[in-house]
Amino acid sequence: MSKKEIIAMILAGGQGSRLGILTRRTAKPAVPFGGKYRIIDFTLSNCSNSGIDTVGVLTQYKPLALNSHIGIGSPWDLDRTSGGVSVLPPYMKETGGNWYKGTANAIYQNRHFIENYDPEYVVILSGDHIYKMNYLEMLDFHKKKNADATIAVFEVPLNEASRFGIMNTDEDDRINEFEEKPKKPKNNLASMGIYIFNWRFLKRFLEEDARDESSNNDFGKNIIPNMLNKKRKLYAYRFNGYWKDVGTIQSLWEANMDLLDDNNSLNIYDPKWKIYSVNPTMPPQYIACNSDVKRSLVVEGCIVLGKVYNSVLFPGVYIGRDTIITNSVIMPNVIVGNNVIIKKSIIGSNARVDDNVIVGTNDNISVVGAGSKVKESIIQ
């Protein structure tokens, strides 16, 4: 294996239990997003656009759809003979195997994969966040600070800071304290779960953590606090762009709706920072003459005979006559019958909604699971 300056390790094994029935059959990073993507596409595209050509994707929970989506990495230009993308499930031994015990244990189990490339730096990423970031700019910051570790942070409203891991820093952005979901936060710099480490430095801490039977083997709970206790040089890298942890139904719906804002800061149309994905071979979308579509994303393969307002339609969606869709996310290959009303809902892939049915209200978000058949109204 050729030596690499930096490689990326993407944590993509999360169950995503807060997404409920949307992750009953698939891992959270493989959940559809934004009309034609899956959530992990943003992290993979960031790697590609940042010039990082060696990526390990650590999978675990129901990985079939995720593994199939990633394939050999062609959409992200990661189908390479040297480096490229590698899917890394938990290791099996002669005596059996276990799931990854925590985020740090996931990296520890795959330390030999990292060693193959003898990197100077490793960037640890989450596969379930929506954002665009140039990791090489973060690496430059890391080098200039002569840091042992650099953690990307995002300013959140102070009244919401208690929901996050908060980094307390000095005037030079050196981290002097980490508080996990503090009741009375001292500032609003939330960890984004994006880390750059000097590999040899991180390896020592991972080995020490693996020997500690009382450890949760987690970066936030164990590795970072241990580094701070030993007075190592950790810095906060402030990120000012769009960032969303889509780990809940509410945040997933909000992130999709954000794309419909004319001035949204994510801007998936930026030709200088494209978001790549596996694009299905489908015919162009068809919008019937008596239909009406406003402020919506409608992608290839869709047939719209009804009305669609402020909604996101994925490939292969069929909207029947006299049907009205508002403020909703309709995932791939959903068939919606005639005279249907869908409000503020997320409809999972391959679901079927029969004629004359009402789904959702303008209050709470209604969710229909993948492959479900809706024969009666759902008003909640």
Curated annotation (Swiss-Prot):
GO terms for molecular function: ATP binding; glucose-1-phosphate adenylyltransferase activity. It comes from the Bacteria. Pathway: Glycan biosynthesis; glycogen biosynthesis. Alpha-D-glucose 1-phosphate binds at residues 100, 165, 180-181, 191. It is an enzyme of class 2 (transferase). Pfam families: Hexapep_GlmU (PF24894), NTP_transferase (PF00483). The keyword Nucleotidyltransferase applies. GO terms for biological process: glycogen biosynthetic process. The keyword Nucleotidyltransferase applies. It catalyses: alpha-D-glucose 1-phosphate + ATP + H(+) = ADP-alpha-D-glucose + diphosphate. Its EC number is 2.7.7.27. Keywords: ATP-binding, Carbohydrate metabolism, Glycogen biosynthesis, Glycogen metabolism, Nucleotide-binding, Nucleotidyltransferase, Transferase. InterPro entries: ADP-Glc_PPase, ADP_Glu_pyroP_CS, GlgC_bac, GlmU/GlgC-like_hexapep, NTP_transferase_dom, Nucleotide-diphossugar_trans, Trimer_LpxA-like_sf. Homotetramer. Involved in the biosynthesis of ADP-glucose, a building block required for the elongation reactions to produce glycogen. Catalyzes the reaction between ATP and alpha-D-glucose 1-phosphate (G1P) to produce pyrophosphate and ADP-Glc. Belongs to the bacterial/plant glucose-1-phosphate adenylyltransferase family. This is Glucose-1-phosphate adenylyltransferase. It comes from Clostridium acetobutylicum (strain ATCC 824 / DSM 792 / JCM 1419 / IAM 19013 / LMG 5710 / NBRC 13948 / NRRL B-527 / VKM B-1787 / 2291 / W). The gene is glgC.
